[in-house]
């Protein structure tokens, strides 16, 4: 038996012995614990949180194209790099054309947003309104009609103008009847139903 065969056999036996040592010795010397905490999953020494199955927006076809551009061309350029003197200017021209085509492909992918890995909905940012639109007037939305203007209401009631909390229910008809009876919301936020037309007639009669 040659020395090469002996060294190969020794290497194989040493590898098998190392594996057996690493599997058997810890089980003999290490302690064993049982319980619910034993079944918990650890991530880098801490208790894991959240779901491990996260859906990522991986554009695999773009990854494959980038692999062609950044990895496979190195394989072809390596052959030129080790034979630059033998290839001469003809080899340089061929390598330059090859690299130019790859650069054009890279620029095309960048124009398509291939390097942008964020989800599309996060990229679209709403434009901030720096100026009010044409015809906008703050006085129009803060206008408070006077009592004289409200008295000409066909119902004879003054609508609720002040701010206040109004409790509503899931029944649309109930809300509609409730809103029809609302005439005024006083400063305390309490809703009062007053027929101001009738009150005005009563005041005239008393006068």
Swiss-Prot record:
Any one GO molecular function term: NADH:ubiquinone reductase (non-electrogenic) activity
**Domain of life (superkingdom):** Bacteria
Q: Which residues are listed as membrane-spanning?
A: 6-26, 62-82, 87-107
Q: Which GO terms describe its cellular component?
A: NADH dehydrogenase complex; plasma membrane
Q: Which Pfam families match?
A: Oxidored_q4
Q: Where in the cell is it found?
A: Cell inner membrane
Q: Its topology with respect to the membrane?
A: Multi-pass membrane protein
Which keywords, in A-to-Z order, does the entry hold? Answer: Cell inner membrane, Cell membrane, Membrane, NAD, Quinone, Translocase, Transmembrane, Transmembrane helix, Transport, Ubiquinone
Q: Does Iron-sulfur show up as a keyword for this record?
A: no
Q: Which InterPro entries match?
A: NAD(P)H_OxRDtase_bac/plastid, NADH_UbQ/plastoQ_OxRdtase_su3, NDAH_ubi_oxred_su3_sf
Question: Looking at its record, which EC class is this enzyme?
Answer: translocase
Does the keyword field hold Transferase?
no
Q: Which reaction does it catalyse?
A: a quinone + NADH + 5 H(+)(in) = a quinol + NAD(+) + 4 H(+)(out)
EC number(s) of the enzyme? Answer: 7.1.1.-
Annotated function: NDH-1 shuttles electrons from NADH, via FMN and iron-sulfur (Fe-S) centers, to quinones in the respiratory chain. The immediate electron acceptor for the enzyme in this species is believed to be ubiquinone. Couples the redox reaction to proton translocation (for every two electrons transferred, four hydrogen ions are translocated across the cytoplasmic membrane), and thus conserves the redox energy in a proton gradient.
Q: How does it assemble?
A: NDH-1 is composed of 14 different subunits. Subunits NuoA, H, J, K, L, M, N constitute the membrane sector of the complex.
Similarity section = Belongs to the complex I subunit 3 family.
Provide the protein name: NADH-quinone oxidoreductase subunit A
Task: Supply the source organism for this entry.
Answer: Psychrobacter cryohalolentis (strain ATCC BAA-1226 / DSM 17306 / VKM B-2378 / K5)
The top of its lineage is: Bacteria, Pseudomonadati, Pseudomonadota, Gammaproteobacteria, Moraxellales
